Amino acid sequence: MIFDPKMLQVYLVGGTQDVHNDVVKFLEKVELAMKSGITAFQYREKGNSKLRPNERVDLGLELRTLCTHYGIPLIVDDDYELAQQINADGVHVGQNDTKIEQVSVAVGHQMFIGYSCNTPEQVERANTMDFIDYIGCGPVFPTKSKSDADTAIGINRLERLNMISERPVVAIGGIDEENMKVVHDTGVAGLAVISLVFDSKDLVATVKKMKNLYK
């Protein structure tokens, strides 16, 4: 699948740890989100996940089937070997994950690559790497979804990072229904969320509100 910045508009991130390690519930919520209009899904099995390596592959293959059915790109967080095993469309790499250059060499042109950047220096460095397709910036606000989350960067820095970046930017971290518009209005290409969707009492309506921002 060829990368398109529009893929970033309604970008759902998650793993079984986000639904109390209930695999069935996880797949049900992901599929409902796909039916409702998310534009990308990132498989992120971290934190309190209880899945063994082989179970991660099996679940990844089920996600691959769902993403293909709904025409949505499947992105894997950090683990490029898992991404290759399940034929993912992309891989997302954090500053503290596997070295971005190593990932680029491993996946070549088989997948698009996202890279987390939270400072102007990190963005400027990313601008020099032609193999990076998009940048993830955050957490914009404090978040409980990631146990290893950095300090919140705030709206002003997000806006600055978006201006500096030569790649499309997706914002993540602490985004909710109250602040999603102010995040969108910074000019970012998309919003990435975890708990906003997985914890929503009306998942369909939540996804539609996000989609409406980019109409």
From Swiss-Prot:
For binding 4-amino-2-methyl-5-(diphosphooxymethyl)pyrimidine, which residues are annotated in this chain's numbering? 42-46, 77, 116, 146
TM stretches of this protein: none
Which Enzyme Commission number(s) are listed?
2.5.1.3
Q: List positions binding 2-[(2R,5Z)-2-carboxy-4-methylthiazol-5(2H)-ylidene]ethyl phosphate.
A: 143-145, 174, 194-195
Q: Which GO terms describe its cellular component?
A: cytoplasm
Q: What class of enzyme is it?
A: transferase
The reaction(s) catalysed by this protein are:
2-[(2R,5Z)-2-carboxy-4-methylthiazol-5(2H)-ylidene]ethyl phosphate + 4-amino-2-methyl-5-(diphosphooxymethyl)pyrimidine + 2 H(+) = thiamine phosphate + CO2 + diphosphate; 2-(2-carboxy-4-methylthiazol-5-yl)ethyl phosphate + 4-amino-2-methyl-5-(diphosphooxymethyl)pyrimidine + 2 H(+) = thiamine phosphate + CO2 + diphosphate; 4-methyl-5-(2-phosphooxyethyl)-thiazole + 4-amino-2-methyl-5-(diphosphooxymethyl)pyrimidine + H(+) = thiamine phosphate + diphosphate
What superkingdom heads the lineage?
Bacteria
CDD domains on file? TMP_TenI
Q: Name one Pfam family in it.
A: TMP-TENI
Query: Which cofactors go with this protein?
Result: Mg(2+)
Q: Does the keyword Transferase apply?
A: yes
Q: Which GO terms describe its biological process?
A: thiamine biosynthetic process; thiamine diphosphate biosynthetic process
Per UniProt, Mg(2+) binds at 78, 97
Cofactor, free-text remark: Binds 1 Mg(2+) ion per subunit.
Record key words, sorted = Magnesium, Metal-binding, Thiamine biosynthesis, Transferase
Function in brief = Condenses 4-methyl-5-(beta-hydroxyethyl)thiazole monophosphate (THZ-P) and 2-methyl-4-amino-5-hydroxymethyl pyrimidine pyrophosphate (HMP-PP) to form thiamine monophosphate (TMP).
PANTHER family for the chain: THIAMINE-PHOSPHATE PYROPHOSPHORYLASE, THIAMINE-PHOSPHATE SYNTHASE
| UniProt name for this protein | Thiamine-phosphate synthase
Which organism does this sequence originate in?
A: Limosilactobacillus reuteri (strain DSM 20016)
